[in-house]
Each structure stands twice: as structure tokens, then as C-alpha cells.
């Protein structure tokens, strides 16, 4: 994949009438020339690398001032892309940054593709592919723990073990190929030692694969649906949990007509909480739509909080809803326990195969900590700490690791079957290639396109 031209893009979020600063980034061989054409730095300011200049951005023909700005100059290779890079730090909003970007394009730059700045950093050797993916994860992080995990990946915490595993495979391959080329000059291979080495590599791959589910939780979060009969306190539960009045709460059944969402973080995991309409038979057409959306939310959720009224106990309505959601991971929330005598709470009946039960008094904001603990237990993560999550692979990396492990298992089978040495090398090369795809040492252009299309244009 070739690097062509000088690229430019807006590097900050564009929000109308918001944001005090907007940045236009330019990278490539013509970046400094474009900056010198557009930027007027008064006085005796020196155009040196890694200095900030103050001045005015002017139209190159009319010399009309477009914006008062700062210019950051970074000469190759000491820049994000390892090319010459300039950044115009303009006033925020839409107009100024769009005008500056347009002047850059008219002066010889082209609009950057999504992720092209990071792609150039990868192609120029500043980042490997795991670090590039970690940048996207860091930008999109939805919790402090997710950001910390992404930062660990950016610092090479994943790349290092992958490179070591690949190097170990290359060492084994070199031993085998040496016997193929110089069989008469070298002692025979120790089959058992090679199998042992391969088993050790496969075991380390398995350890990396075990981080996939935790990584996905940190990246995509957990979707939790609160379901139950009308007026059991679902909206009160959402409000108490989110510490806000996200949902309307009344004593009238059917108040919630649509799905209400709230974004939370539980034990480092981003959680999307869905407060749904009470599920019941109704002739109200609007409420019917809400009930159907409740069922859809329950069927697509990662976890269902089946909420019941402890004051009325388990009803036929609760049983009907339970039959609809029992195939999903489920926590039974016994709400309104403040309305029930303490000695009666433990005698409340419910289906025997429900193993996770939480007692809450949502209107009094009681039981939320117990609910969060139960959620962390049911997703089998425990309290996620940043130190536990230094390694967390994504789906692409997991697929490559799985392929590498399968190839190594095939090498073991080939050795056990006492096939010729040439056969040993075939699957070993497959494992080496799969590991190389993770860091980018062996990767196709289509894979790069797919990875970097996730990025915003200015990154």
C-alpha cells in the first residue's frame, strides 16, 4: 500500500456553536509549504520543529484574514505520522475550521480518508497494527477501564507477547528447515522437545484468547433490559440506578410507553440500561406498541432484570413474563421490599431455577449496590480493574490467534504421524503468518482498509 500526496482533515469534533478550539491537521511532504502559504506569523518567530507559532491564517490570494490562530509544526520523523505535520489551532465551531480546511485543500492537500493519519503512522513504522487498533479503542472508550486497557495496547502490552510467540515459531521453523537442507551435517530433531515447545506456545495463545470476552465487554458494553408488569417500579429502578429522573414515575399502570435508555458504568463495564413498558394484555394501541418493544428489548438484551412487586408477590402475570424471558441471562429483582415486613421477604415464592435474586426499594434508592454486584457475578467478570485488563484482544485478533492455534495443533499431528519434515513446515508457516497478521508484519491491503475505516477522518 503506497502513501500518496499530502493529506488534511479536521482533527476535532465539529459541534455547532460549541468548542473553544478546532484543529486542522496536515501531513505529508507539502505540509510545511502549505502552512507557509497560509500562515502569517508576525515578528521574529522562528519556524522550527515542535514550536508553536502565533499569527493569522490568510487567504493566499486576497491576504484576507480568515482566523487568528496558533500553528504547531512537527518535522519528520518526530511526528505522529513520521511525516512533516502541521496543525492549525483555530477558533472552535464550524465556520473557521471548515474555511481553513478548504484553504489547505486549495493549496495542494487532499482530504484524508478515515484513519489515514494513523495508517501512515503504521506504514511508516511508528505503530504496529495492535497499537493502531488501540488508538481507535481509546478514542471510543466508554469507561475509564476501557480507556486504560486501550492505553496498555497502545504501549505495546499486546504486541510484545505476540511478537515473542511468533519468534518462537520462527526458531522452531529454522531448526526444521536446517535439517531439510543439511540433514547429513546435523543431529536428528528431538520430536518430543519440538512438541513440548509447540504446546507451550499454544498454551500462551489460549491465555490470550481468554481475554476476548472481557475485551468485548469493555468495548461494546452490556445491554440490560428492565422488564416486568406495569407499576412494579421499573422506572423508579432506572432513576435510582442512574441517579436521575430519566423515566416518568406515576402510580398509573402503563405510564411508560416506550423504551427509555440510560448509559451507566458498572465495575468498569459500560452498561446500556433499557427501561421498558410494563408487559400486559391491553387494548390501548399505543401501549400495545410499547409492550411489543419491551419484548424485543428483552430478546436482544445481554441480561434481563425481571422486576416484580414484593408487596404483591409472584403473580400469574410475572410467570407469563418469565416464560418469555427465561432463555436469557436473568436476575430477579424483588422491588418495593420497604412495603413488606422483613420476616416475610425470604418467604416470597418464585421459580426454583432462578438463582440470582436481588432485593431493592427503588423509591428509597436501596439495593442498587447489590444489583450491580449481581450483574458482575452473572457476566462472570468480577470487579474489573485496569490491572486485570492490560491484555484484551478484539475479534480480528482472536480469529488470527485461533487460526495460529489450529495450525500448531496440526503441526503436532503431523509430527506424531511421522510425516516428512516438509509437511511440518507447512502448518508452522501458517501459524507464523496468523501471528504476523495481528501485529501487521503480514497483512493484506483489504484487512488494513477494514481496520482503518473504523477511524474518524482526522485520526
Swiss-Prot record:
InterPro entries membership: G_TrmE, GTP-bd, GTP-bd_TrmE_N, GTPase_MnmE, MnmE_dom2, MnmE_helical, P-loop_NTPase, Small_GTP-bd
Domain of life: Bacteria
Pfam family, one: MMR_HSR1
Binding site for K(+): 231, 250, 252, 255
UniProt record, GO biological process: tRNA methylation; tRNA wobble uridine modification
Annotated compartments: Cytoplasm
Residues where Mg(2+) binds: 235, 256
Main location: cytoplasm
Keywords: Cytoplasm, GTP-binding, Hydrolase, Magnesium, Metal-binding, Nucleotide-binding, Potassium, tRNA processing
Disulfide bond annotation, renumbered to this chain: none
Gene3D superfamilies: P-loop containing nucleotide triphosphate hydrolases, Probable tRNA modification gtpase trme, domain 1, tRNA modification GTPase MnmE domain 2
GO MF assignments: GTP binding; GTPase activity; identical protein binding; metal ion binding
Record-listed GTP binding positions: 231-236, 250-256, 275-278
Family the entry assigns: Belongs to the TRAFAC class TrmE-Era-EngA-EngB-Septin-like GTPase superfamily. TrmE GTPase family.
Complex formation: Homodimer. Heterotetramer of two MnmE and two MnmG subunits.
UniProt-listed HAMAP family: GTPase_MnmE
Name of this chain's protein: tRNA modification GTPase MnmE
Gene expressing this chain: mnmE
Amino acid at each position: 500500500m503506497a502513501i500518496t500526496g499530502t493529506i488534511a482533515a479536521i482533527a476535532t469534533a465539529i459541534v455547532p456553536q460549541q468548542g473553544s478550539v478546532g484543529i486542522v491537521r496536515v501531513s505529508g511532504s507539502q505540509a510545511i509549504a502549505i502552512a507557509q502559504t497560509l500562515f502569517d506569523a508576525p515578528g521574529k518567530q522562528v519556524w522550527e520543529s515542535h514550536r508553536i507559532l502565533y499569527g493569522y491564517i490568510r487567504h493566499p490570494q486576497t491576504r484576507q484574514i480568515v482566523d487568528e490562530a496558533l500553528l504547531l509544526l512537527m518535522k519528520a520523523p518526530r511526528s505522529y505520522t513520521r511525516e512533516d505535520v502541521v496543525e492549525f489551532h483555530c477558533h472552535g465551531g464550524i465556520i473557521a475550521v471548515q474555511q481553513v480546511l478548504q484553504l489547505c485543500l486549495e493549496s495542494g492537500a487532499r482530504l484524508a480518508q478515515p484513519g489515514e493519519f494513523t495508517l501512515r503512522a503504521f506504514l511508516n513504522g511508528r505503530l504496529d497494527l495492535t497499537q493502531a487498533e488501540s488508538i481507535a479503542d481509546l478514542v471510543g472508550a466508554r469507561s475509564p477501564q476501557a480507556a486504560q486497557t486501550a492505553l496498555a495496547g497502545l504501549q505495546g502490552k499486546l504486541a510484545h507477547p505476540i511478537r515473542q510467540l511468533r519468534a518462537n515459531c520462527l526458531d522452531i521453523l529454522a531448526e526444521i528447515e536446517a535439517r531439510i537442507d543439511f540433514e547429513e551435517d546435523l543431529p536428528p530433531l528431538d520430536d518430543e522437545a519440538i512438541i513440548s515447545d509447540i504446546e507451550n506456545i499454544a498454551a500462551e495463545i489460549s491465555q490470550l484468547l481468554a481475554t476476548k470476552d472481557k475485551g468485548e465487554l469493555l468495548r461494546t458494553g452490556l445491554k440490560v433490559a428492565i422488564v416486568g408488569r406495569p407499576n412494579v417500579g421499573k422506572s423508579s429502578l432506572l432513576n435510582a440506578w442512574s441517579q436521575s429522573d430519566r423515566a416518568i414515575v406515576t402510580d398509573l399502570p402503563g405510564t411508560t410507553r416506550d423504551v427509555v435508555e440510560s448509559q451507566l458504568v458498572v465495575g468498569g463495564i459500560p452498561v446500556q440500561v433499557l427501561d421498558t413498558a410494563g408487559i400486559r394484555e391491553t387494548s390501548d394501541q399505543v401501549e400495545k406498541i410499547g409492550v411489543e418493544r419491551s419484548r424485543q428489548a428483552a430478546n436482544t438484551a445481554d441480561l434481563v432484570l425481571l422486576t416484580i412487586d414484593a408487596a404483591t408477590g409472584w403473580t400469574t402475570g410475572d410467570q407469563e413474563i418469565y416464560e418469555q424471558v427465561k432463555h436469557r441471562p436473568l436476575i430477579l429483582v424483588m422491588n418495593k421490599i420497604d412495603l413488606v415486613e422483613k420476616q416475610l421477604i425470604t418467604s416470597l415464592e418464585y421459580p426454583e431455577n432462578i438463582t440470582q435474586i436481588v432485593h431493592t426499594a427503588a423509591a428509597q434508592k436501596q439495593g442498587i449496590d447489590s444489583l450491580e454486584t449481581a450483574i458482575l457475578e452473572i457476566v462472570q467478570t468480577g470487579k474489573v480493574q485496569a490491572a486485570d485488563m492490560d491484555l484484551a484482544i478484539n475479534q480480528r485478533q482472536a480469529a488470527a490467534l485461533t487460526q495460529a492455534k489450529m495450525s500448531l495443533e496440526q503441526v503436532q499431528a503431523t509430527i506424531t504421524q511421522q510425516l516428512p519434515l516438509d509437511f511440518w513446515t507447512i502448518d508452522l508457516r501458517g501459524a507464523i503468518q496468523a501471528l504476523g497478521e495481528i501485529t501487521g508484519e503480514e497483512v493484506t491491503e483489504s484487512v488494513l482498509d477494514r481496520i482503518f475505516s473504523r477511524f474518524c477522518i482526522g485520526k
